[in-house]
Amino acid sequence: MSNFLTYVKEHQNRFLEELFLLIRIPSISADSAYIPEMQKAAAAVQEALAKAGCTHTELCPTEGFPIVYGEKIIDASLPTVLVYGHYDVQPPDPLDLWDNDPFDPIIKKTALHPDGAIF
């Protein structure tokens, strides 16, 4: 476990930048004006999966926004692990109620506060 924690600490800045890249994309699926941003977010997630070591990634078309799929088969006889999530966000309106830009993550008191994301 200590090797893992050391690795995370050594690469923390890179991890944050990769996370911030996604948070900065206003991927608002409820508003058709943001269709290009949804496509951009899907492509960014696909790229992140590839960088994380997935040997196969794919954008699977749907009637709405694409499903982002990635896999890495280490040994077909081992159990499968599935990670499921979403890459869209809620509309930030009304904007005047935000203290900060909802798509510009900031770090306060060493804690991440991306107003456009929930952790």
What are these regions (language model features)?
Residues 78-119:
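Active-site metal-coordination/substrate-binding segment of hydrolases
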